[in-house]
Amino acid sequence: MKRTYQPHNRPRKSTHGFRARMATKNGRNVINRRRAKGRKKLSV
């Protein structure tokens, strides 16, 4: 059986990357929450 996680950088960045997050209001909320929490990495 094939495992579920087959990493590829392009889809990873296009769905979870900083630019993708900033593109929508909810994504900006995610970034702001992570900033408020003091996360070292805001996105992948």
Swiss-Prot record:
GO molecular function: structural constituent of ribosome
Source species of the chain: Sulfurimonas denitrificans (strain ATCC 33889 / DSM 1251) (Thiomicrospira denitrificans (strain ATCC 33889 / DSM 1251))
Presence of the UniProt keyword Membrane in the record: no
Family listed: Belongs to the bacterial ribosomal protein bL34 family.
Any Pfam family matching the protein: Ribosomal_L34
Protein name: Large ribosomal subunit protein bL34
Compositionally biased region (Basic residues): 1-19, 31-44
GO biological process per UniProt: translation
Residue intervals passing through the bilayer: none
